[in-house]
């Protein structure tokens, strides 16, 4: 893929999980895989292929005293996603100097899959926050859920806060294809091949791209090459 589209700027951001960043909190002698060697090898391979590897590990370790991950779930928190966005912005040459946000808690009763599957800390609940951009120049986005043929003016499906899967607040969960349109001054399109970690990450990018096309390879069965041509991804 990288070779076929060498004319496109390409980036890869792999979310390290909490075991990697918060290894000091693991029980003594807990068996874990060495994520760092795997990520380092992946970084080398992608770099050789012309893909810019966005490494957030050092940034996360600098902020590991903050809640970067949910206590009951495997995902990063919105705070963690924000730090990942700042690191990505440096690599992607995005100017974040004017970015300001209001951090708003939307629930304090989230219980994620780690707790649900293991039964550990079954009484503990997490807080989910959203970062709302502020200022006079905030642009409104339109979110198009392609397969569902549904549009929304918000990244957040608050109805999901009344369900067991409260993390689905972000975009209502995972979808094969989502298109985000924002009337930015620059006419640029970003294609994001993603998993669920991106759901709380991509909203930070919306103010900087005229169009963002999110594709989840786990559910998308269309022709990606054709999609790139149709959407004028550069």
Language model region names:
Residues 1-234:
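Extracellular glycan-modifying ectodomains
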């Amino acid at each position: 893929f990288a070779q076929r589209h060498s004319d496109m700027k390409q980036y890869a951001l792999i979310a390290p999980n909490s075991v990697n960043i918060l290894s000091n909190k693991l029980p003594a002698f807990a068996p874990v895989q060495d994520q760092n060697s795997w990520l380092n090898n992946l970084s080398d391979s992608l770099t050789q292929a012309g893909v810019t590897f966005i490494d957030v590990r050092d940034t996360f370790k600098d902020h590991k005293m903050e809640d970067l991950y949910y206590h009951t779930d495997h995902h990063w928190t919105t705070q963690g996603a924000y730090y990942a966005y700042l690191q990505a912005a440096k690599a992607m040459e995005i100017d974040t100097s004017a970015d300001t946000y209001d951090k708003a808690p939307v629930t304090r009763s989230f219980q994620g899959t780690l707790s649900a599957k293991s039964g550990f800390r079954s009484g503990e609940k997490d807080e989910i926050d959203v970062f709302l951009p502020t200022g006079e120049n905030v642009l409104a986005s339109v979110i198009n859920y392609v397969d569902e043929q549904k549009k929304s003016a918000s990244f957040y499906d608050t109805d999901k806060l009344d369900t067991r899967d409260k993390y689905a607040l972000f975009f209502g969960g995972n979808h094969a294809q989502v298109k985000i349109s924002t009337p930015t001054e620059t006419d640029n399109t970003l294609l994001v091949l993603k998993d669920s970690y991106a759901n709380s990450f991509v909203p930070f990018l919306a103010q900087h791209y005229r169009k963002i096309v999110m594709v989840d390879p786990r559910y998308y069965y269309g022709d990606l090459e054709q999609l790139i041509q149709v959407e004028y991804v550069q």
